[in-house]
Amino acid sequence: MTLTAESGPLAGSRTDVAGELRHVDKWYGNRHVLQDVSLQIPSGQIVALIGRSGSGKSTVLRVLAGLSHDHTGRRLVAGAPALAFQEPRLFPWRDVRTNVGYGLTRTRLPRAQVRRRAERALADVGLADHARAWPLTLSGGQAQRVSLARALVAEPRLLLLDEPFGALDALTRLSMHTLLLDLWRRHGFGVLLVTHDVDEAVALADRVLVLEDGRVVHELAIDPPRRTPGEPGAHTERYRAELLDRLGVRQ
């Protein structure tokens, strides 16, 4: 596993960390969008990042993904992170298997091997029989499954999810939660889930971070983590109330 860092050496780096930011600051013009942000995503953990619109959640994800370089502080990732967004961003003129294979662009693998790995990734998300389908024929849930397959085809240690289920209906969302947890259990990657949905954060995460005006202002460990989406947990309302209070939402 390759550890990569920016903005100076990372003393004490450990291979059980999938992704980490240390004292990161970022500006957009005169706006200080990230202020001394430090966070860690251990391998095999799901960390949710919640906050109001404009709090800097997607910027944190972009810095971790290596898509933003004009920041101060330190970034540590295990290998190349994978991303999935709210919009699947599939190429409509390429079939599903080819879209998934684009997740291996950096590897320069032979074409036949790319096809095999893409087909295996599609089987992983329950779409083995859709390899030759066209993106425009897919439902919203199927398209998001293809997006996950593309993210995971390169076998990343860190998966970054930016509101991936926000555009789906309630039942499809629960199905995607179950799929994500199944993939997480089987592959053991670390996850940073950016979401505006407090219930989703409590349902999926080991830890929830609250971002406010570019700062991490609260961290909540979900103990024990609830791993059965759609089923109520005795602790759910308590955690939900605490997070809503930190977000300034009156119940």
Swiss-Prot record:
Keywords: ATP-binding, Cell membrane, Membrane, Nucleotide-binding, Translocase, Transport. The keyword ATP-binding applies. SUPFAM superfamilies: P-loop containing nucleoside triphosphate hydrolases (SSF52540). One of its GO terms (cellular component) is plasma membrane. Its EC number is 7.6.2.14. The complex is composed of two ATP-binding proteins (SsuB), two transmembrane proteins (SsuC) and a solute-binding protein (SsuA). This is Aliphatic sulfonates import ATP-binding protein SsuB.
